[in-house]
Amino acid sequence: MICIFQQSLLTIIFMEIIYTSHLEFRLRVRNIPYDLPREIFGQSKEHYYDNLTRHHIAIQKMEFEGKLRELALTYDRDENMIEMITIHPIKPHQKNSRISSGRWERI
């Protein structure tokens, strides 16, 4: 479960978090701490909708492999559930390209 605070309405929403098997595999392969996707989702001030994949993306700068990097968390959500799909480092030019092309829309 995750607690989401909506700043504008002072509303608290509890949502179930599901890690896909693909995300769990990526966490193991990339040596990423298990709770990092939850941290990214909860702390990120950058959330996008990907018009190509139809998934949501959360971007957060975190320490990864000894460096400060932006990590992209791909997820789907509905009224009471967040399904976290994958996580990976993203380079600034990749993020900027997806935003400027209109592929990613800020939400």
Roles of regions detected by a PLM:
Residues 1-107:
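Ribonuclease/tRNase effector modules and their secretory precursors
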